[in-house]
Amino acid sequence: MSDETTISLEDGYPPLEALTTMVPPADATGFSQSLLTFAAVMTFLIMIVGICGNLLTVVALLKCPKVRNVAAAFIISLCIADLLFCALVLPFQGLRFVQGTWRHGQVLCRLIPFIQYGNIGVSLLCIAMITINRYVMITHHGLYARIYKRHWIAVMIAACWLFSYGMQLPTLLGEWGRFGYDSRLQTCSIMTDDHGHSSKTTLFITAFVIPCLVIIACYAKIFWVVHKSEQRLKRHATKQNSIPNNLRPLASTGSGALPSGAECQPSNRVSSDSSSSFSIDVPETAPSGKQQPTRVKDQREVRAKRNEWRITKMVLAIFLSFVVCYLPITIVKVADKNVEHPSLHICSYILLYLSACINPIIYVIMNKQYRKAYKTVVFCQPARLLLPFGKTNGASSAAEKWKDTGLSNNHSRTIVSQMSGGTGAASGAGTATGTAAVAVMQTPPEVQQAQALEMVSRGPDLISKSNLPQPNVTPPPPSVLTATPNGSNSNSLTLRLPLKKNNHCYTNSGFNSSTPSPSSGLGIGISSSSIYRPGVGSLGSGSASIRRITMVGDDIILEEEELPPTPPATSAPTTPAPPPPSSPLHPLSTDSSTTTISGGAVVAGSSAPKPATPTPHIYMNVDSPKRNQYYMDRNTNAVAPESDSGPANTSATVSISGSKLTAKMKFPKD
């Protein structure tokens, strides 16, 4: 036979290169070489910027205290997802553009799109979680503290990752669509399985459409609440401006005393605090020693709201950038299934990759605190690590929520939890009952030893450290805020803190311009010239100024303005240490001081003071009803005499145990 059939071994056994290479079809030449080169350069550039930016953001959020809050936990999760996308997905996509096809095998052709779509889903879900966090903080701030606790934050973040990757497991296993090489796009993507099923539509609805709708609904509600709040503020400002100047309360009078109750201002701020708060403006001491009259302000509220709104706008910008980067590739794949316009596909892929590196740029542009955090990391400035999210070192929940609002950087915040007084060994005990009984501790003007408020630092993260040079003075361990007793001393600055019961918390009950009365609240006399902080000195010399005293929940918080560059070196006010009791007898039998009940108020006084004899400190613990049981177990309560002054709705109890005196306010249940 002249005609012989030749069988080539290559027809039956393909070369080894074909086992690991998906060669594009002949009609795939629509992707020009210049277009692929441009795409490769942009992909590698985005990869470098994304890795550096997201890694820098994670380190900055973990290192810098002032950006550590609940939203930062979700931002860290978002940055980790983008970091994995840039480090694991973009290198292979860049090589795909360089080589013109996929040359990395079937296994990576399945894993890379699995990681790609998983990280995209995690990013959008984290943005949705941050938006919900903003929504709860602004519109339902009463629930914020109960929802965003440490363990719940971890559960939310874990749910984002598990849901995003769990939705793709059937596709990875080939049970519902499959990951494979798309010859039309020359990339690995989601393909139909042998039964013609694909998970693209379901993943698009569950991982993109639903989170976007949730985000849009939350922001619509946020903008509505903010708009209403701005309208109320404008009406309030118009009403305040219409009041004549001679009728507006001033922070000080000619004698230097603050009008009683003239500075109490209620505030229901839209923030992360779960309870209302009240603030008192203390007139700052000018360098000349004269007190400047100031109007009633609430700058703490303005700063907190402004910071919350700034973070909200930043998250909105992140969401809009994600939508802008993700929508083009979705539209192009639906409108151009046959890849008739290759340049549109290349540009849409570049926009998709850009979403992984644009978030750090938004942080730098829109948030001043993030810029400072980046500088701290880049220039290796010292910064301390904080405790885990949602937890502080012994701080109360109110203080923790206070920290989460991200208040101004130029203010130091100190919690005041105890009040001691040098009134002599008070004797006697009594209980006053009435509709709004009040305990007012008074001492005669002859007794010069002042009452004091011990400022207890609940956690190192709650007090801003001053960068000023420290004087050569050894201050006492705790900061001390001395309070001049209420009496005839005209140089004292009398502050009235009217309190009322509101969901088992002390809040303000409005203005009180009258003298102490059973309905006025708890009176505390504070001298503006006797406020002392270690390393700073006395405020009376013009070295610093306490501008605000605020109670949030169970804690009294002092807010201190930024200090001048060179404060004078002053010494700390010293008080004699309490001596041990000389006899086992009760103070009632050895001292002439008396405790009386007058007009619904408990008044502790002394008819014959002895200035020459050192008197022990008398500690008054002013706490909310939830802490009453603790002090009841520690102190000996006085027997409450019956009172005919009114119904027993509210009671003030003064009890003496040794040299300790405890004043407690009890309220009926709601």
Curated annotation (Swiss-Prot):
SMART domains: 7TM_GPCR_Srsx. GO terms for cellular component: membrane; plasma membrane; pleated septate junction. SUPFAM superfamilies: Family A G protein-coupled receptor-like. The keyword Disulfide bond applies. It comes from the Eukaryota. Keywords: Cell membrane, Disulfide bond, G-protein coupled receptor, Membrane, Receptor, Transducer, Transmembrane, Transmembrane helix. This is G-protein coupled receptor moody. The lineage of its organism: Eukaryota, Metazoa, Ecdysozoa, Arthropoda, Hexapoda.
